[in-house]
Amino acid sequence: MAIFCNNVLAALPTQCNPGFLDDLPPRIRKVCVALSRIYELGSEMESYIGDKENHITGFHESIPLLDSGVKRQDVDHVFLRFGRRR
């Protein structure tokens, strides 16, 4: 979805240029303002996600992996069966 949004938002309509906004009908002006807000929000989300990815990558690199060479014996999860009894 991010690729689709980037392609759409990167090419705002020429009618939404600040020089043309005064000449536009109010409804079209509202659409242009909404598109501008969506573009700003999208770029802020991309920068936030980029910051999070950098933080997570650094966090994972700082944790050493434990490799004892022994298969784990503990129970990590429980399988539950739902439905009718046979």
Swiss-Prot record:
Subcellular location field: Secreted
As for family, the record states: Belongs to the myosuppressin family.
Q: Mainly resides where?
A: secreted
Write down any Gene Ontology CC term. Answer: extracellular region
One of the protein's GO biological processes = neuropeptide signaling pathway
The alphabetized UniProt keywords are: Amidation, Cleavage on pair of basic residues, Neuropeptide, Pyrrolidone carboxylic acid, Secreted, Signal
Tree of life domain? Eukaryota
Name of the protein: Myosuppressin
Query: What positions are modified (Pyrrolidone carboxylic acid)?
Result: 73
- PTM annotation (Phenylalanine amide): residues: 82
Q: What does this protein do?
A: Myoinhibiting neuropeptide.
What positions belong to the pro-peptide in this record? 19-70
